[in-house]
Amino acid sequence: MKKIISTLLASCCLTSLIAQEVVVKGPDEKLQLVVSASPAEKPSYSITYNGKTMLEKSPLGMNTNIGDFAKGMKLTGHAVTPIDTVYHQDRIKTSKVHYQANELICNFENPKGQKIDVVFRVSNHDVAFR
């Protein structure tokens, strides 16, 4: 019985040290974004297209006068929302643009409890974040 309880406690402790990953794909599912966070590393993101690496694991975060949002960040939540809009531009060849993407909002928290959201948009050919 003690062995089982010890194993459960150890697995709970190790779970908090394991990296958290969130995956979102473009509407055609060829372009894929992976956002990962682990207490031991800086948050990062990587991009693949048809299984081929386009952007290797790159650090994500910033250090500002408000707080350090680069080290020890914990991914506290995320939400994925599909976007499907049509808009018009009169100064380009194709004046009617049909934009489709999947938006990922990642909620991070630093060790001091300060929060920051990072918004990613993954379309069929592009990835953007702010």
Give the residues covered by each predicted segment.
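Acidic, contiguous internal or C-terminal segments within carbohydrate-active enzymes
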Residues: 35-38, 97, 101-130
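Hydrophobic transmembrane signal anchors and adjacent membrane-proximal interface regions, especially
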Residues: 3, 20-24, 64, 97, ...
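Short, basic/low-complexity N-terminal boundary segments at the transition from targeting/disordered tails
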Residues: 5, 11, 81-85, 129
